[in-house]
Design a protein with these regions (language model features):
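Class I Rossmann-like S-adenosyl-L-methionine
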Residues: 1-174
């Protein structure tokens, strides 16, 4: 249990230290290089919390940083999260809902420009609401399957419990 609060505290610490002088990916890599106590799972979760914060922080300007982290995680996740289960167990049933439904659940009345500030610069062919809300989801990662491994790769992903979409014979979206 305290591990999850440690994740929140560490993410909060990282965000307070970050000044924007360098790309965040480089900054957080240096942070973890200096702090050897974090394993790969810890680094992954803490990084995810930080990136969720960057996607959603402008939606909640008047709340504490740690609560922004939790709300960001809630909005950007569709899988069960131990942090959400611990901090806001009443939100667990909403995790599988769409980002738009989650925003309504949190009673967030913000403008779409608060998610993506350059919405007015988009072409008319782009649906501004769908485009802004798409920033709350992690984009797919595409895997190219080499010839001869068309059956092996999907089997290994299924065995590992990783959900994926078969795009064609040689491509998978994770």
């Amino acid at each position: 249990m305290s591990r999850y609060y440690s994740y929140l505290n560490t993410a909060e610490n990282i965000l307070q230290q970050y000044r924007g002088a360098e790309p965040f990916a480089i900054f957080i890599k240096k942070f973890f290089a200096a702090e050897k106590k974090y394993g790969s799972g810890d680094r992954k979760m803490i990084s995810h919390l930080c990136y969720c914060y960057f996607r959603t922080a402008t939606l909640f300007p008047d709340i504490a940083l740690q609560e922004k982290l939790v709300k960001g995680l809630f909005l950007c996740s569709d899988q069960p999260s131990d942090i959400i289960s611990l901090v806001h167990p009443e939100w667990v049933d909403m995790l599988s809902k769409s980002p738009k439904e989650k925003l309504e659940f949190l009673a967030c009345k913000k403008n779409l420009a608060d998610i993506f500030p350059f919405i007015s610069e988009c072409s008319n062919d782009i649906n501004p609401e769908a485009f802004a809300i798409s920033h709350l989801s992690q984009p797919d990662l595409f895997i190219r399957i080499r010839p001869g491994f068309e059956k092996l790769v999907p089997e290994k992903l299924e065995k590992a419990g990783i959900t994926f979409r078969q795009i064609n014979e040689s491509a998978i979206a994770v």
